[in-house]
């Protein structure tokens, strides 16, 4: 049994998101929540909320036990970039790129992960 939570269009670069995602991949959800709670990164706050949502989905929709859940998959993919311009000297302009990303997090019980 696996349950998925998806967050799209997050104002975060995918590279910074992957640093946090790699730390919690494969961990039990209790340990992953503790690790994210004490991480100083912006991505940790975002991924922690998404993990709590995935846990709630698993409990409510599937009737899963929290103690049996672990982070089976987490992907951080590139989303569309926001483009802004900054005025420069002599009538020129520079582009400011504000990256976004999509995060997909799947939690599953330990029995389904052994398959």
Curated annotation (Swiss-Prot):
SUPFAM superfamilies: Ribosomal protein L22 (SSF54843). One of its GO terms (molecular function) is rRNA binding. Keywords: Ribonucleoprotein, Ribosomal protein, RNA-binding, rRNA-binding. GO terms for biological process: translation. Transmembrane segments: none annotated. Pfam families: Ribosomal_L22. GO terms for cellular component: cytosolic large ribosomal subunit. InterPro entries: Ribosomal_uL22, Ribosomal_uL22_bac/chlpt-type, Ribosomal_uL22_bac/org-type, Ribosomal_uL22_sf. Belongs to the universal ribosomal protein uL22 family. Part of the 50S ribosomal subunit. This protein binds specifically to 23S rRNA; its binding is stimulated by other ribosomal proteins, e.g. L4, L17, and L20. It is important during the early stages of 50S assembly. It makes multiple contacts with different domains of the 23S rRNA in the assembled 50S subunit and ribosome. This is Large ribosomal subunit protein uL22.
């Amino acid at each position: 049994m696996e349950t998925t939570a998806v967050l799209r269009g997050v104002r975060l670069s995918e590279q910074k998101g992957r640093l946090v995602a790699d730390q919690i991949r494969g961990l039990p959800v209790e340990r992953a929540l503790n690790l994210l709670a004490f991480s100083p990164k912006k991505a940790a706050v975002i991924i922690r909320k998404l993990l709590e949502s995935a846990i709630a989905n698993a409990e409510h929709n599937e009737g899963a036990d929290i103690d049996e859940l672990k982070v089976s998959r987490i992907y951080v993919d590139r989303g569309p970039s926001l483009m802004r311009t900054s005025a420069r000297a002599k009538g020129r302009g520079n582009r400011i790129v504000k990256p976004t990303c999509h995060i997909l997090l799947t939690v599953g019980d330990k029995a389904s992960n052994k398959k």
